[in-house]
Amino acid sequence: MDIMHAAVLGILQGLTEILPISSSAHLILVPWLLGWPESGLTFDVGLHVGTLIALCVYFRRDIAYLISDAITGLREGFGSQTSRLPFFIIAGTVPAAIAGKTLEKPIEEFFRGSHTLIALLLIAFGLLLALADTTGPKRWRMDRVDLRGALLIGLAQCLALIPGVSRSGITITAALFLGFTRDTAARFSFLLSLPIVAGAGILKMGELARHGIPAGELAPLLAGMATSAVSGYLGVALLLRLVQRYSLYPFVWYRLLAGGAVLAYLFAR
């Protein structure tokens, strides 16, 4: 993989991992449509690390507060909601961590060539996001997050292993159906993703440490990491601004158009 391809895929990963439009679908469909080779383990590590950097930088204050609240809870008890929130996030991470460890590779192998199914899932879960955005009561803020809600959103996150679903999309959808505001749903979705993205990056770095970085792949690795970090940061800012001021419908329409375009291409071949 050359540096240009790496930079393009890094931008694609950074934006689509953050926005509710499915990064896994785009990282399968775009190289397939353009005739590019599949990315290897080295490049996957760079993309995950870049996304993690973007999330950690953007939510650095939230992370600091969560760590402080967790320490306070351990020292003084969990009488306040803020002291319980870090552990709700950890609890919500457990279902996806288990599912990812056991099902990621079989699902990845099954969907690798299932372009029609991926396009249909882009459309179907886009419509589900539209339904949640339209009908969800949108009353509750972060102080109403409890263990039940965190676990339900965490269970929904398991579906993100399927290309076309979108991790941020399905967790925001679940949070909206539970009654949270758009802003709270998006912010909790990102906080819930931090342990998952970090864990995936650590596992892939462990594999990379065992195999080593192949000759000629360091430059694409760094290019993909840098572009995914920058585009991921911009993606977070864009999504939070849109949900605060408008709605999630721009992403719904994008999913419908992208899925429809892929289906049209497949049927026209």
UniProtKB/Swiss-Prot annotation:
It catalyses: di-trans,octa-cis-undecaprenyl diphosphate + H2O = di-trans,octa-cis-undecaprenyl phosphate + phosphate + H(+). It is an enzyme of class 3 (hydrolase). Its EC number is 3.6.1.27. It comes from the Bacteria. It is found in: Cell inner membrane. One of its GO terms (molecular function) is undecaprenyl-diphosphatase activity. Keywords: Antibiotic resistance, Cell inner membrane, Cell membrane, Cell shape, Cell wall biogenesis/degradation, Hydrolase, Membrane, Peptidoglycan synthesis, Transmembrane, Transmembrane helix. It is a multi-pass membrane protein. The chain crosses the membrane at residues 1-21, 40-59, 87-107, 117-137, 147-166, 188-208, 220-240, 248-268. The keyword Cell membrane applies. Catalyzes the dephosphorylation of undecaprenyl diphosphate (UPP). Confers resistance to bacitracin. Bacitracin is thought to be involved in the inhibition of peptidoglycan synthesis by sequestering undecaprenyl diphosphate, thereby reducing the pool of lipid carrier available. This is Undecaprenyl-diphosphatase.
